[in-house]
Amino acid sequence: MKAFGFLKIAIIFMVSGSSTATIQKTAHPALPTPAQLQKMSSRFSPTPMRVETANLTVADRQALAKLVEAARFFDEIFLKQLWSGNLELYLTLQKDRSELGKARLRYFWINKGPWSDIDDYKAFLPGVPPRKPVGSNFYPEDMTKQEFERWVATLSPAEQESAKGFFTVIRWADKKAGTLAITPYSEEYRDQLSKVAALLREAADLTENASLKRFLITRADAFLSNDYYESDLAWMDLDAPLDITIGPYETYNDELFGYKAAFEAYIGLRDDAETAKLSAFTQHLQEIEDNLPIDSGNRNPKLGAAAPIRVVDQIISAGDGAHGVQTAAYNLPNDERVVNQKGSKRVMLKNVQEAKFRNVLVPIAMRTLSRNAMVDVNFSSFFTHILAHELMHGLGPHQITVDGRETTPRAELKELFSAIEEAKADVTGLFALQYMMDHASAMKLGTVLPSDDAAQRQMYTTFLASAFRSLRFGLNDAHGKGMAIQFNYLVDRGAFVEHGDGTFSIDMTKIKAAVQDLVHDLLTLEAEGNYSGAKEMLDKMGVIRPVLKRAFDRLQGIPTDIEPIFVTAEELVPTVSSKPSATPKPSRKKSVRKK
């Protein structure tokens, strides 16, 4: 839940020895002009990210500088993961100093590629495929799903696991024979990962925090061994002022199967006061699991250890965490072995969320909600629901049995899983918050979760406004497609109401039951590993209907998301390469301060 550019990003690209494809000369409709590219870029509101680091020890501040330097390498790796011709194209764009060249370079850097994330991955540059390859560069661009599946069927169980694993790329061994080869990330990206590993070890030598030291050392080892299990466990135990997430995690860019993880980095400073306050929610997750509106046999009678929550102010993000729509929070790791043993961790990027709320959500609410509903939109409801969303990724079915096989919803739903899972986390988050509001007194949540009628109305109304925000990400984004399911379902149930003037509000007499029913449907799809049912739901509900198109027409000129400018990171470690963006830095008077 994951634009960039005006500040200089230090990326020292390895030109020699890199594997790049010949850029395809593909015909396109008329490509955007400089003015049109500027308009496309303006959908991302430039937002300086300042974080006060004065309270860090000298050692941790020195370690932070090493981590910022390490994070920047992930932009290079991600460029390679997205498309085989990406790095060569980026280097070419930097040489074009014309007005058009500068506009192209800037929008390329926002997307980390030549396809616009929020325009269904449509190409905006010449000489590239008209759309992002569905398998990105995790697989051969000309490989079909059927070719992969036929080849996998010939492998041993261990080889099949590796072929479908998070941390391998697939290449042709002999295309005529239909045979493929498996290459671990540790080999495919060794040049960059060896440098990152060295920087992590330097940071580990500097910090005095034992848990941070252990995570950095084990993650450095993982980058070279391709085994991330021990470092994922160490990440779950991380308890330090510097909050670090760095590695291959999310699989959204693998639209072919949803198997392959992209590299990303988030470096931030923990907000201890907010973290302590929100951690109260984790004490009640088992009770919520026990009351999910799903067949009791599909509930988890014993969740993993209480899921830790971290509220963080982001200093820098990179790689998969730094393109298109920005991540506001995340729930990791995705390794089910770790989730079963230790649960998962929810990280809330508070300064990112504040920027999204201020620059995007409030303007959207002013145009899409009725006047009476508008007063119910507030940041607290927005922030709390994002937390609930991340918590809900850890609830519901994770290990299932299909036709006698032990498997997972992710494995059974394949490329459909991400959209179904994002919809499930959203709407189950509403269900969970409503449950906690209904039991706030018994749960002793009164100080962190208001539960009166006004608070409930504010929660649902803020979610409605945020639905329009998410839907603008486009249907190729798992969050956007997942939100389309929810929006259409709740409109059909009369819970979201459109008025004659084109504005919307909540019908409080219908919303609670509609949410509960949708939670049931989504959780059941996952519990049964029902691929055909998930496809039917997505085909029917994961669409933009006329009611949404009318609403979108009212949102012209409002940014879709933010474009973070990592001011503090730049001050800590000034970059040495020419900046990717061709636009001057905005005035610092817009900077975000969060202590």
Where are these regions (language model features)?
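Bacterial Sec-dependent signal peptides at the C-terminal "C-region" and cleavage site
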Residues: M14-P32
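C-terminal, non-catalytic "cap/extension" segments appended to globular domains
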Residues: N488-K595
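N-terminal helix-rich structural modules
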Residues: A27-T207, S211-F215
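Contiguous, non-catalytic segments that form substrate-binding/exosite surfaces or channel walls
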Residues: Y185-M374, N378
